[in-house]
A protein has these predicted regions:
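A conserved hydrophobic secondary-structure block that centers on an alpha-helix together
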Residues: 1-45, 49-54, 133-142
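Conserved "right-hand" nucleotidyltransferase catalytic core of DNA-directed polymerases
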Residues: 59-60, 64-169
Length: 169
């Protein structure tokens, strides 16, 4: 883990975009748990709002970031297509390729079922805002643990490998 500290969100996002734009750092595929409806929209909107649309479009090697709407259970969600980068949401892959229904599709539940591991507990905080403002170190560890759980799910299940094989065969 490469942890960097910044005094402002502007500096953080500028540094991230500068790092991302280095060709060897730009991914061909991004993944995460519910990344299509949470992580990517959050990142795109924060970059757009804090440092501007021009730099937000640099997330795409082609300068093409488009907004789309999807409806789940009648509720509208915004998602973004980042041209030149495939988004393989591990939650979607799990639902598509594991032919069994689960009582919950939260990462914590699926990690327990598949890996016998759980997310880092943060129940001592009343709200998520309290968590990241009053327990910063644990908040960082919580996010790292989430990434590790998705990585371990892929190590075990090979769903990204399967999706890529199906796409290119």
């Amino acid at each position: 883990v490469d942890y960097r500290s910044f005094s402002t969100e502007y500096d953080l996002l500028n540094n991230f975009i500068s790092w991302w734009m280095i060709e060897s750092n730009t991914p061909e595929v991004v993944t995460g748990w519910n990344s299509k409806l949470y992580d990517i929209p959050y990142l795109v909107r924060r970059i757009d709002r804090v440092i501007g649309e021009k730099l937000m479009k640099r997330l795409s090697p082609w300068g093409l970031v488009t907004e789309d709407e999807t409806y789940i259970s009648g509720r509208k969600h915004l998602c973004y297509d980042i041209g030149g980068i495939s988004q393989l949401d591990y939650l979607d892959l799990y639902k598509k390729f594991t032919y069994k229904s689960q009582e919950s599709y939260r990462l914590d539940y699926i990690a327990e079922v598949e890996l016998k591991q759980k997310k880092l507990d943060h129940s001592e905080f009343d709200t998520f805002k309290d968590f990241y403002t009053k327990g910063w170190q644990k908040f960082v560890e919580y996010n790292i643990k989430d990434v590790e759980l998705v990585d371990r799910l892929e190590d075990k299940m090979k769903l990204i490998e399967l999706a890529l094989t199906m796409a290119y065969d």
